[in-house]
Structures are given as C-alpha cells and as structure tokens.
Amino acid sequence: MEQAIAPPLPIRDYQYQTPSIPGSSDYAWRTFVFVTFGLLIAVGVAWLAYTLFLKDLILVCKAKKQRRTEEIGYGNTPARLNGDQQGLPR
C-alpha cells in the first residue's frame, strides 16, 4: 500500500511572522529605552539614599576624625571655660 503525500498546508497571513533583524532600529530603540530607564532609576535610588541617610553617615564619619558629633558643621568651637579642649591633640 502506498502512502499518499499530502500537499503542504498554506500559510495564512496571521500565522506568518516576519523575522526581526537584530540590527534593526526597533531593537536599537528598545535597548536605548531600557538603558535610559535603568539609569534614571539608578540615579533616583542614589539620590534618595543620599537624602535619607548617606548624608548623615558622611557627617558621622567626619565627626569621628574630628571632635564630637555635636560640633560638626559649626566650625572651630572655642575652648571651654575650664580649659578643657576635649578632642584636640595635646
């Protein structure tokens, strides 16, 4: 018994998808938009972190190198009346 070879089924318009070329402008725009949004989100997170707690962390680190935390930002504080210059090298 011979097997009948069926003719190929026709491809309808809604079944066929044109292959996308990786170098097309659509791919380039998609990459550009993805990178741009990624950078905006990264800058936003960095700004928010600086605003919320990094600024204070930097001041505390500077305070450890200098005198005390209360005296940060006020410039050179004068010596105390009892002559105690706490935190100054002798």
Swiss-Prot record:
Membrane topology, from the record: Single-pass membrane protein
Alphabetically sorted, this entry's keywords are: Host membrane, Membrane, Transmembrane, Transmembrane helix, Transport, Viral movement protein
What processes does the entry annotate via GO biological process terms?
transport of virus in host, cell to cell
Write down the Pfam families for this protein, in alphabetical order.
Gemini_mov
Main localization is: host cell
Q: What do we know about how this protein assembles, alone or with others?
A: Interacts with the capsid protein (CP). Part of a MP-CP-viral DNA complex.
General function of this protein: Involved in the viral transport within, and between cells.
Kindly provide the name given to this protein in its UniProt entry: Movement protein
Q: What is the lineage of its organism?
A: Viruses, Monodnaviria, Shotokuvirae, Cressdnaviricota, Repensiviricetes
